[in-house]
């Protein structure tokens, strides 16, 4: 699924592309939502995050709002209390990973998948199993093209 890119004008008339992927802090919130079986209230997200981060409840709410503005999550209003929202992920973890990876390659490797993969392979120590797994992925991609 292609993401929708939002363009806004900055002062001086320059066009700026609005980010549509989760930031590092937003990713922590998304991990909680992706791990959940169902939608969660802000209070539930905050409770789950208290075990792993020192982020304030206010900041979690701010991040939920940013994620909603980016179209990564959505919410339903509680039937009994209109002040309570139930948040859920609109984009899967895999979708976000692919989009983040694409932006990373575009930003740091001028869109070259080959250069990005070469840099990652050269900077990482892999086991024989990991090399084999990568080889299998490349072969599968090659078969899928034909």
Predicted regions span which residues?
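Amphipathic alpha-helical dimerization/coiled-coil segments
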Residues: 98-144
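Glycine-centered, phosphate/nucleic-acid-interacting loop/turn motifs that mediate DNA/RNA or nucleotide
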Residues: 71
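Short helix-coil junctions and helix-kink-helix linkers
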Residues: 47-55
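Short alpha-helical segments that sit at the start of domains
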Residues: 2-31, 110, 144
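Short beta-strand "wing" residues that participate in macromolecule-binding interfaces
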Residues: 75
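Short acidic, hydrophobic short linear motifs in intrinsically disordered regions
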Residues: 39-48
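Short amphipathic alpha-helical interaction segments
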Residues: 54-66
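Short, cationic-aromatic polyanion-contact patches
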Residues: 21-25, 78-99
């Amino acid at each position: 699924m292609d993401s929708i890119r939002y363009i806004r004008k900055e002062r001086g008339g320059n066009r700026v592309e609005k980010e549509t992927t989760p930031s590092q802090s937003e990713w922590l919130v998304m991990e909680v939502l992706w791990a959940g079986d169902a939608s969660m209230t802000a209070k539930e997200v905050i409770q789950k995050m208290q075990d792993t981060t020192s982020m304030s409840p206010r900041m979690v709410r701010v991040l939920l709002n940013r994620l909603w503005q980016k179209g990564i999550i959505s919410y339903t209003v509680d039937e009994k209390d209109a002040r309570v929202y139930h948040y859920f992920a609109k984009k899967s973890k895999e979708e976000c990973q692919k989009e983040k990876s694409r932006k990373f390659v575009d930003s740091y490797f001028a869109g070259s998948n080959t250069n990005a993969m070469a840099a990652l392979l050269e900077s990482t120590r892999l086991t024989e199993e990991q090399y084999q797994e990568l080889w299998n992925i490349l072969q599968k991609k090659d078969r899928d093209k034909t």
